[in-house]
């Protein structure tokens, strides 16, 4: 396919137009008085949202050169969302400012590589100062504050804080749709994995269709159980103890499953069997997690163990186990606390070392199951549109709260970025780099300026007054008052602010040093080839409908 090429000023100007179109759309949502944006959906009702990354991902411009600029800023938002889970609009505003101011200087003859060097130096200094003024997020009240600022709702902040209080900072917190109009928090204590009972005849509660086991023994193996004789000696010992038994195995088939069910129905013993969670190597790791949690030994060939070798010492214990058709929940496993802590640390090390997003996600799930319970926030609303919008806000609040716990918090509303300006201005940079430093100094003001203007105030006036205030004093755009931001509960996670600045600076510096841009040339009709294919007559497709 033929290509169009643009060079130097023409190339950068086209990309700036795209950057501005996306950023101007996103930045209207910033702050407590930010507006919403309505997104058309191909099916269902439109989505009304003020979530920056959701808006950015929807934008695709007709002009290919402008679209490249827009997609670069969209990447800033996405990267910030991936790292910190929030701060996407702030990152977009910072990127627009750096690109816009940078292009003015490049057009005036400044050295793009010198500007890039200055941007990197100023960003590094700003990040250092943000970390210096950061305070830890340790109390439940602080988590409420972080969640409230992110979502714009104190109630949402309370849900997040309650959930983290129940399951721990590393615990699993999921966000689901509620069938009612009220939002509620449901906490599942202990470890849960997505495998249910192998036979409905194993249930003990016919109304809930659940099997409840009190103080059960737990047999864990990665083997398939086909012959009941393999575990018969062990079953006889469990019967003598008059305790229920949970069997977690690769599978149970042949004569083994009917025999277990028959003895359960006759009342010989109370047993529930379930398949092992996960697949392949991940299954082995998850079985070992369960074993550590319950104090069991995994019956596996890796350890040279056979099912017939299993003894009562091989079994784990728990205070309670609940099994339904889809899930198994183990509450208060009897594993050694030191062994559990060592296992948690091992998984944390694996999370830090892995380069695969998928592996990292699965490792974090395992970590959460070991480190805490499972909390479910069920989001209710009067309409589907409202429910979608609320879910996005709760997701942002949850991510912000976790980021706050991880790296602490700073004054919110863009105040912290203005607070570090004086330290960044002290940088000793050469003539080319000082231009880049000044570009970052200007960008650090932009979030406060945009928040103020969205609330109907003059941004430049607010910034000048803010620069003369003591550390921690800032402008509450919701009320129009000057307050101690932390005392007023207006805080941002340090990780969110840091990630927004670093990602914005990184992409913007690269864009400023761009000298040529290459894009596919549209076809003769003025449409993209891809767009033209969408209107193809169904009769031209190779075959009719079946």
From Swiss-Prot:
Record keywords, A-Z: ATP-binding, Chaperone, Cytoplasm, Isomerase, Nucleotide-binding
Binding site for ATP: 29-32, 86-90, 413, 476-478, 492
Highest taxon of source: Bacteria
Span list, region Disordered: 521-546
Predominant location: cytoplasm
Membrane as UniProt keyword: no
Top enzyme class: isomerase
Family designation: Belongs to the chaperonin (HSP60) family.
Function: Together with its co-chaperonin GroES, plays an essential role in assisting protein folding. The GroEL-GroES system forms a nano-cage that allows encapsulation of the non-native substrate proteins and provides a physical environment optimized to promote and accelerate protein folding.
EC number annotated for this UniProt entry: 5.6.1.7
Organism whose genome encodes this protein: Tetragenococcus halophilus
Protein name as it appears in the record: Chaperonin GroEL
């Amino acid at each position: 396919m033929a290509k169009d090429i643009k060079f130097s000023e023409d190339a950068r100007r086209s990309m700036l137009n795209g950057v501005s179109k996306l950023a101007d759309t996103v930045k209207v949502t910033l702050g407590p008085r930010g507006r919403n944006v309505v997104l058309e959906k191909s099916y269902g009702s439109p989505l009304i949202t003020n979530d920056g990354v959701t808006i950015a991902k929807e934008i695709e411009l007709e002009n290919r050169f402008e679209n490249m600029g827009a997609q670069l800023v969209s990447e800033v938002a996405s990267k910030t969302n991936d790292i910190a889970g929030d701060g996407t609009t702030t990152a977009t505003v910072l990127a627009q400012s750096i690109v816009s101011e940078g292009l003015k200087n490049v057009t005036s003859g400044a050295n793009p590589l010198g500007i890039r060097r200055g941007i990197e130096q100023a960003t590094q200094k700003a990040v250092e100062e943000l970390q210096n003024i950061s305070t830890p997020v340790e109390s439940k009240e602080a988590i409420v504050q972080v969640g409230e600022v992110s979502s714009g709702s104190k109630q949402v902040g309370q849900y997040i804080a309650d959930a983290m209080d129940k399951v721990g900072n590393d615990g699993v917190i999921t966000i689901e749709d509620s069938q009612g109009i009220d939002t509620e928090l449901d906490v599942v204590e202990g470890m849960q994995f997505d495998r249910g009972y192998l036979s409905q005849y194993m249930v003990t509660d016919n109304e809930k269709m659940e099997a409840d086991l009190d103080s059960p023994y737990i047999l864990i193996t990665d083997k398939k159980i086909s012959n009941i004789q393999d575990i018969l000696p062990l079953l006889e010992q469990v019967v003598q103890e008059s305790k229920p038994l949970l069997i977690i195995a690769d599978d149970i088939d042949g004569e083994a499953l009917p025999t277990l069910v028959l003895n359960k129905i006759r009342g010989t013993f109370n047993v529930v069997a379930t398949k092992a969670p996960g697949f392949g190597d991940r299954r082995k790791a998850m079985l070992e997690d369960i074993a550590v949690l319950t104090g069991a030994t995994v019956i596996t060939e890796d350890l040279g163990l056979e099912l017939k070798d299993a003894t009562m010492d091989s079994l784990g214990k728990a205070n309670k186990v609940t099994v339904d058709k889809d899930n198994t929940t183990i509450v208060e496993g009897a594993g050694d606390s030191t062994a559990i802590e060592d296992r948690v640390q091992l998984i944390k090390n694996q999370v830090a070392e892995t380069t695969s997003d998928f592996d990292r996600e699965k490792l974090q799930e395992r970590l959460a199951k070991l480190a805490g319970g499972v909390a479910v926030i069920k989001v209710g609303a009067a309409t589907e549109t409202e429910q979608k919008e609320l879910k996005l806000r709760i997701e942002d609040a949850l991510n912000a709260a976790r980021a706050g716990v991880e790296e602490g918090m700073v004054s919110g509303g863009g105040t912290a970025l203005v607070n570090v300006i004086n330290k960044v201005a002290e940088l000793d940079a050469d003539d080319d780099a000082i231009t880049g430093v000044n570009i970052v100094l200007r960008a650090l003001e932009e979030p406060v300026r945009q928040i103020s203007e969205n609330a109907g105030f003059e941004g430049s006036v607010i910034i000048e007054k803010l620069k003369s205030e003591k550390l921690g004093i800032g402008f509450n755009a919701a009320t129009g008052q000057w307050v101690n931001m932390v005392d007023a509960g207006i805080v941002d996670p340090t990780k969110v602010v840091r990630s927004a600045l670093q990602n914005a600076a990184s992409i913007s510096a690269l864009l400023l040093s761009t000298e040529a841009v290459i894009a596919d040339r549209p076809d003769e009709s003025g449409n993209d080839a891809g767009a033209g294919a969408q209107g193809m007559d169904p009769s031209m497709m190779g075959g009719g409908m079946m």
